[in-house]
Amino acid sequence: MSEKQTGSANGGLGKTLAQLEQVVSASLRPLPSQTGDGTYVTEQVKTGILKDLSHVDLGDLKTLVDVSKSALTGEALDDRKYIMERVIQLSAGLPSTSQIGKELTNTFLTTLWNDLEHPPISYLGRDAMYRRADGSGNNVLWPHIGAAGTPYARSVQPKTVQSPNLPDPETLFDCLLARKEYKEHPNKISSVLFYIASIIIHDLFETDRKDPAISLTSSYLDLSPLYGNNQQEQDLIRTFKDGKLKPDCFSTKRVLGFPPGVGVVLIMFNRFHNYVVEKLAMINEGGRFTKPQESDTAAYAKYDNDLFQTGRLVTCGLYVNIILKDYVRTILNINRTDSIWSLDPRSEMKDGLLGRAAAQATGNQVAAEFNLVYRWHSCISQRDQKWTEDMYQELFPGQDPSKISLQDFLRGLGRWEAKLPGEPRERPFAGLQRKADGSYDDNDLVKIFEESVEDCAGAFGALHVPTVFRSIEALGIQQARSWNLATLNEFRKYFNLAPYKTFEEINSDPYVADQLKRLYDHPDRVEIYPGIIVEDAKESMAPGSGLCTNFTISRAILSDAVALVRGDRFHTVDFTPKHLTNWAYNEIQPQDSVDQTHVFYKLVLRAFPNHFRGDSIYAHFPLVVPSENKKILTKLGTADKYSWDRPNYTPPPQFINSHSACMSILSDQETFKVTWGSKIEFLMRHNNQPYGRDFMLSGDRTPNAMSRQMMGKALYRDKWETEVKRFYENITLKLLHRYSYKLAGVNQVDVVRDIANLAQVHFCASVFSLPLKTESNPRGIFTESELYQIMAVVFTSIFYDADIGKSFELNQAARAVTQQLGQLTLANVELIAKTGFIANLVNSLHRHDVLSEYGVHMIQRLLDSGMPAPEIVWTHVLPTAGGMVANQAQLFSQSLDYYLSEEGSVHLPEINRLAKEDTTEADDLLLRYFMEGARIRSSVALPRVVAQPTVVEDNGQKITLKQGQHIICNLVSASMDPVTFPEPDKVKLDRDMNLYAHFGFGPHQCLGLGLCKTALTTMLKVIGRLDNLRRAPGGQGKLKKLSGPGGIAMYMTPDQTAFFPFPTTMKIQWDGDLPEVKE
């Protein structure tokens, strides 16, 4: 009998004996007497832990450890380890009576249940994808929660018995609130912070005068003061054209009764919305905003509404980011630290040891108590107090606003509001006049904003509300009483704050404490309002206390902020790139490297692109007055990153479009000066030593010309053309072999990202001794992609810093990477300087590189001039390299893009034939093909500043230019000028080679012109040899580009999250095998 058979027999015997034991046991049982139906009462026996452990092996213990670790730490489980299956095995292997098995199964079931929302909180469909005008539908299952026109909630149960005969409201004002003397805010917070607060308050609270229990606005941060409280109001603010709002308008009338700075901030949001919808339509991500014919009324209405609603989501997203990253950080005084921490309720939370994660997207209903929490009239500045007094004199001529009866005050406000037109564009604002297009003059709006940033707000506390607000405060006290709310102490207990036992605890000022005692008799009887605004104010603490508000308010507003944001579906689960688009989602995101995540500058610079420098302190930190910001940032060591000048209008540059005018300007070094010097010096300054001023493109002085001569001699040595051609043929083919692949048997490669860009990186690394990490140089520092990004950022910062909204971020990043690259390059150059030309250096830096000797010789020739190594690197090598990589890459990509287009592809068979001939004549024709393709697809524009008044003739028009005026030589239009290039849309191989514009003209013409033509023609030859060359299917085979000012192309990153000056990706396909690389 085999061992297996023996085991089977023994198992069968054991089973038989067990059954026999059950039969014997049953026969010995007494007759059942506990039940009426004659059945036995059975009791399920649970096995003990020792019995359970007998069924557990070491693998099961590891399963329990892995599951427990994940539960405790929140770490994701690696499903490749089959943990779920091991849990099932463990559960199934335990006895059916096992308590551990039952708990394990229940835990598994709970985990599976908790994986999904119950009920779901995010839904598909057009009805759920956008905010409704009245705020309803935020919670899809409870659509009315938080909607405009619904009652206030009550947060705190009012249990304290209060006297029906409470103190007279106006007496309370006179005793506790009336401003005796003005006190500046202790942290020098500007009035702009309180303008944001005013917008938030009126976004959330608008009490119905007919029924004070009702709020006429939604309970969400949805910018209803701009967009309206309901559909009727929203329709009044919309143009119903391309998703836009009426220019420089806002919905609410109430803001017209506030200092004009509040309205200016709303106008800034209006402009941001219109900027966003323009870009959304231009990008048209995934065909989402394809514009139909306006004659198709239904389709156009959908197009307009999709743009408007998405634009609103984006604008509200920036609004909330400003609240969380600028407003709340300033309230908590985190702006005085270098921390990037913020109280962001959108944080992803998971259940942990300290409790369950906070729910999200539940909806929100504002409470009446919080209507009172945000009454911050004590912080009104002296300037805004004067403005309010002047306004009230217009409303109540000849009367003292502090002595007007409540009835007269209400009648006066009613008359004022009734006179305001329903049409937003017709309402008066700050005495400003609208222009023909309906907008206000930027100068007027900027002046209001600038003065508001400089205006220090007042301090919180008792006896600090301007007397002009006497009637408003008295009405607020009456309104609070009509809501029958809890007392101050009850409100404090709700937040687990210690109740006040004495009046001196409420306010340490003996006068205020005594007044409270006379008015209320006992601390428990002090009303929530005005109680919360007469408390002592908190002292400044960095970080922690920046607003320095009253104690109870400081706690309550943080709870409210979390509820408002975390409870809003559109700020949490539906705040995604899929809802906002990739570009828009990225556009409003904070950056850790910029302003410690503050984002207010995104609003300012989009609203007023011609008034603020990209580094203006007025744009970046407007919630604190500039003089105090100077102290803060000096202490943090970042003050020198910002401009402290007041905003100043800079006219947009004058575009010059004709070929003849551009050639004339670029050749006239006396009248038209280059503009890049200050940026080059900014990037190249090192260890407090100035570098870069003498670089060839930094100016028009003699040292700049000498720089050009020196670098020209170093670059163009004997046999340079042969070596460059050989290098580019070799590297292009190498890159094709390395990065191409087959998809379903078809050859494919990203010709922009992996070939055009990287070939230039390898060239510059070889020539300028840059620390590129490759297979042959594994000790290099930067990968190919990293070095391209560095060179592209440097080039963009110097030559393409055209987007004011991204300027600060761009320039700070460019300086950081320039400094890092420069120090590493300097080390290489100093090694050459110390040792001369040595084979070991060549071999260790660039093994098998046909240009390595060329590069070391070039550095040696620069050193032979007697110039110090740091001057060579920072003033000459880095700026030259930075000007080559991205520029050469884009010219090749643009030229190839043309020949892959429908109109250009007719030339591909001839290019393919010429590329295979490998003769001088064929190469000359390929050069002409390259130059024509680059001309047709060029995106080059060169700026100049006018040094002396002059007149330029451009396309038959005489243009008068003033000294100091900035101009743009638009080489895109110049390259398509039919006067110079007859039939400009066609490829003609007999054009005059000296007329091509995309390398510039005159004394600052591209130094690498000859080198570039040889290099890029060689690349076209290598790519052109590929048979049946074509675009990859769909969008992957095309450059994502948009038309910018002057027709100059703007490209996008592969994920379309941002604009980029150069092509970033384009995939091509071809037939057949690649030629072998010749070493």
UniProtKB/Swiss-Prot annotation:
Pfam families: An_peroxidase (PF03098), p450 (PF00067). The active site is at Y374. Gene3D superfamilies: Cytochrome P450, Haem peroxidase domain superfamily, animal type. GO terms for molecular function: heme binding; iron ion binding; isomerase activity; linoleate 8R-lipoxygenase activity; monooxygenase activity; oxidoreductase activity, acting on paired donors, with incorporation or reduction of molecular oxygen; peroxidase activity. GO terms for biological process: biosynthetic process; fatty acid metabolic process; response to oxidative stress. Bifunctional heme-containing enzyme that oxidizes linoleic acid to (8R,9Z,12Z)-8-hydroperoxyoctadeca-9,12-dienoate (within the N-terminal heme peroxidase domain), which is subsequently isomerized to (5S,8R,9Z,12Z)-5,8-dihydroxyoctadeca-9,12-dienoate (within the C-terminal P450 heme thiolate domain). Oxidized unsaturated fatty acids, so-called oxylipins, derived from endogenous fatty acids, influence the development of the asexual conidiophores and sexual cleistothecia and regulate the secondary metabolism. This is Psi-producing oxygenase A. Belongs to the peroxidase family. Keywords: Dioxygenase, Heme, Iron, Isomerase, Metal-binding, Multifunctional enzyme, Oxidoreductase, Peroxidase, Virulence. Heme b binds at H202, H377. InterPro entries: Cyt_P450 (IPR001128), Cyt_P450_CS (IPR017972), Cyt_P450_sf (IPR036396), Haem_peroxidase_animal (IPR019791), Haem_peroxidase_sf (IPR010255), Haem_peroxidase_sf_animal (IPR037120), Oxylipin_biosynth_metab (IPR050783), Ppo-like_N (IPR034812). Its EC number is 1.13.11.60, 5.4.4.5. Its cofactor is heme b. The keyword Transport does not apply. It catalyses: (9Z,12Z)-octadecadienoate + O2 = (8R,9Z,12Z)-8-hydroperoxyoctadeca-9,12-dienoate; (8R,9Z,12Z)-8-hydroperoxyoctadeca-9,12-dienoate = (5S,8R,9Z,12Z)-5,8-dihydroxyoctadeca-9,12-dienoate. Residues 105-446 are annotated as: Linoleate 8R-lipoxygenase. It comes from Aspergillus fumigatus (strain CBS 144.89 / FGSC A1163 / CEA10). Homotetramer. Residues 654-1079 are annotated as: 9,12-octadecadienoate 8-hydroperoxide 8R-isomerase. It comes from the Eukaryota.
